[in-house]
């Protein structure tokens, strides 16, 4: 029996460090990053969904939204055939993803695959996601896209260097992070019940002492956190050929 692939997008962030949208009387208004417009006219979230929902292997999608999110109703993907439902995001990313997993309990089998992808990574390449699927299809747990660290890394206290970290075995985690449904559900349930604070799914898997596979990806798969990232994403998307 083949395994299905489901997508969870945690998009419940309400960070407002970037606010470039204007209202109908030309006032600047604060807006969550995932709803900022790219140069191609799409919001960051819609560009992200455009790439992922176009992948044939992905059967369905759950999106975790902020409690008072009114902007997703304007999304061109609001009624997409692959959108199973939206759920309310939690206080932290892990809670949002866990809520998404609970919404899949009547659909997904334990050995089906769950891809979790940041809503503000709109430059991910479909070919690299498919490569992730192919590399992990026989793995019992899962893994994630990542890039090798190339810069020299310093450990410091109060801006004073303590030591230089050996970068030869260091990787920078990206998304999607892809794990078996049953494993990821157990991992997130465990870290939440134990009061742990984690920032990605791979950390929850590590907490269960399970192993994740790193699959090399492009540095263009950036996470947009500031205006400089937004400019860089616009540049990368002009180079996007897929």
From Swiss-Prot:
Presence of keyword Acyltransferase: no
Site (Positions MEP for the nucleophilic attack): 167, 223
Record-level Gene Ontology MF annotations: 2-C-methyl-D-erythritol 4-phosphate cytidylyltransferase activity
Catalytic activity: 2-C-methyl-D-erythritol 4-phosphate + CTP + H(+) = 4-CDP-2-C-methyl-D-erythritol + diphosphate
Assigned EC number: 2.7.7.60
Taxonomic superkingdom: Bacteria
A Pfam family matched in the record: IspD
Site (Transition state stabilizer): 17, 33
Enzyme class per UniProt: transferase
Keyword entries, A-Z: Isoprene biosynthesis, Nucleotidyltransferase, Transferase
Entry annotated with the keyword Flavoprotein: no
GO BP term (any one): isopentenyl diphosphate biosynthetic process, methylerythritol 4-phosphate pathway
Known pathway: Isoprenoid biosynthesis; isopentenyl diphosphate biosynthesis via DXP pathway; isopentenyl diphosphate from 1-deoxy-D-xylulose 5-phosphate: step 2/6
InterPro entries: IspD, IspD/TarI, IspD/TarI_cytidylyltransf_bact, ISPD_synthase_CS, Nucleotide-diphossugar_trans
Annotated NCBIfam families: ispD (TIGR00453)
Function, in words: Catalyzes the formation of 4-diphosphocytidyl-2-C-methyl-D-erythritol from CTP and 2-C-methyl-D-erythritol 4-phosphate (MEP).
Family: Belongs to the IspD/TarI cytidylyltransferase family. IspD subfamily.
Protein name stated in the entry: 2-C-methyl-D-erythritol 4-phosphate cytidylyltransferase
Gene expressing this chain: ispD
């Amino acid at each position: 029996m083949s395994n299905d692939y489901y997508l969870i997008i945690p998009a419940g962030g309400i960070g407002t460090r970037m606010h470039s949208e204007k209202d109908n009387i030309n006032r600047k208004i604060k807006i969550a990053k995932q709803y900022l417009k790219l140069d191609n006219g799409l919001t960051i979230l819609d560009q992200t969904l455009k790439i992922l929902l176009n992948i044939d292997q992905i059967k369905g999608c759950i999106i975790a939204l902020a409690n008072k999110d009114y902007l997703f109703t304007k999304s061109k993907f609001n009624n997409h055939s692959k959108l199973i439902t939206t759920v309310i995001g939690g206080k932290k990313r892990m809670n949002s993803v866990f809520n998404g997993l609970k919404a899949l309990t009547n659909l997904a089998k334990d050995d089906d695959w769950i891809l979790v992808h940041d809503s503000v990574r709109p430059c991910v390449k479909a070919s690299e996601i498919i490569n992730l699927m192919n590399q992990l299809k026989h793995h019992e747990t899962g893994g994630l896209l990542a890039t090798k660290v190339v810069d020299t890394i310093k450990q410091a206290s109060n801006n004073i260097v303590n030591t230089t970290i050996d970068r030869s075995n260091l990787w920078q985690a990206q998304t999607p992070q892809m794990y078996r449904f049953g494993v990821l559900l157990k991992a997130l349930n465990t870290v939440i019940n134990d009061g742990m604070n984690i920032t990605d799914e791979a950390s929850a898997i590590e907490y269960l002492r399970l192993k994740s596979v790193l699959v090399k990806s492009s540095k263009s798969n950036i996470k947009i956190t500031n205006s400089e990232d937004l400019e860089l994403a616009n540049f990368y998307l002009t180079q996007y050929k897929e």
